[in-house]
UniProtKB/Swiss-Prot annotation:
Species per Swiss-Prot/TrEMBL record: Homo sapiens
Tissues/organs with expression: Liver and promyelocytic leukemia cell line HL-60.
Lineage: Eukaryota, Metazoa, Chordata, Craniata, Vertebrata
Source superkingdom: Eukaryota
Annotated Polar residues bias: 222-241
Subunit description: Interacts with CD81; the interaction prevents nuclear translocation of HHEX. Interacts (via N-terminus) with SOX13; abolishes the SOX13-mediated inhibition of WNT-mediated transcriptional activity via competitive inhibition of the SOX13-TCF7 complex. Interacts with EIF4E; the interaction inhibits EIF4E-mediated mRNA nuclear export.
Name the UniProt record assigns to this protein: Hematopoietically-expressed homeobox protein HHEX
Keyword Cytoplasm: yes
């Protein structure tokens, strides 16, 4: 089979079979291999003209542009070096060296800050806000439970002052420290005195009943506990003067209202 020799017009318009033809062809075509694009090797010399043969003209037109179809072909030879640098930066091994999605790494950093482990080894979320001492509120004050408050109020209605054995027994029953019971009674007496000053007539009967019940309870105690108590038989009289003596001798506590701070030994034990 004979192939006609392509003319100059056919060579200029001819389309290679393996790669698209550049829009602007240089005077001396340069093969676009990977080595040439990345600038790793010298440019291949222009093939020397040979005698016309049935396939020589077709081969001379196709061989300089025989390049893999997945490699991009530059539009203009003046941009070949710039495109080579861009390709090396985009498709090189160091082009994607950094993390594509830094958000999971940031979440992990925050997760370590939010997740902590308690002494038992269980993870807790937002532990700085959840791990708080029992009945502890802002300012270092203790918030008593409803049951504890009810029992303390019942005890205060019948007895305004507590002896050390009574304070110890009440603290053990309510699972509180003696210091907490002592301070609660101190604050409660301060509040009671303020109410008494505002309405002194309505509190006289309550004071007498409280004094009588306190004397009756102390007389029923064993002799050893009566020794530790600070009440005398002369103080168990319904007169107001004897009650003032009772308040001055039964306890060394002041009646100034103070904040109840948590007992560290009690909370650690609990």
């Amino acid at each position: 089979m004979q192939y006609p020799h392509p003319g100059p017009a056919a060579g200029a318009v001819g389309v290679p079979l393996y790669a698209p033809t550049p829009l602007l062809q240089p005077a001396h075509p340069t093969p676009f291999y990977i080595e040439d694009i990345l600038g790793r090797g010298p440019a291949a010399p222009t093939p020397a003209p040979t005698l016309p043969s049935p396939n020589s003209s077709f081969t001379s037109l196709v061989s300089p542009y025989r390049t893999p179809v997945y490699e991009p072909t530059p539009i203009h030879p003046a941009f070949s070096h710039h495109s080579a640098a861009a390709l090396a930066a985009a498709y090189g091994p160091g082009g994607f060296g950094g993390p594509l999605y830094p958000f999971p790494r940031t979440v992990n950093d925050y997760t370590h800050a939010l997740l902590r482990h308690d002494p038992l080894g269980k993870p807790l979320l937002w532990s700085p806000f959840l791990q708080r001492p029992l009945h502890k509120r802002k300012g270092g004050q203790v918030r008593f439970s409803n049951d504890q408050t009810i029992e303390l109020e019942k005890k205060f209605e019948t007895q305004k002052y507590l002896s050390p054995p009574e304070r110890k027994r009440l603290a053990k029953m309510l699972q509180l420290s003696e210091r907490q019971v002592k301070t609660w009674f101190q604050n409660r007496r301060a509040k009671w005195r303020r109410l008494k000053q505002e309405n002194p007539q309505s509190n006289k009967k309550e004071e007498l009943e409280s004094l009588d019940s306190s004397c009756d309870q102390r007389q029923d105690l064993p002799s050893e506990q009566n020794k530790g108590a600070s009440l005398d038989s002369s103080q168990c009289s319904p007169s107001p003067a004897s009650q003032e003596d009772l308040e001055s001798e039964i306890s060394e506590d002041s009646d100034q209202e103070v904040d109840i701070e948590g007992d560290k030994s009690y909370f650690n034990a609990g």
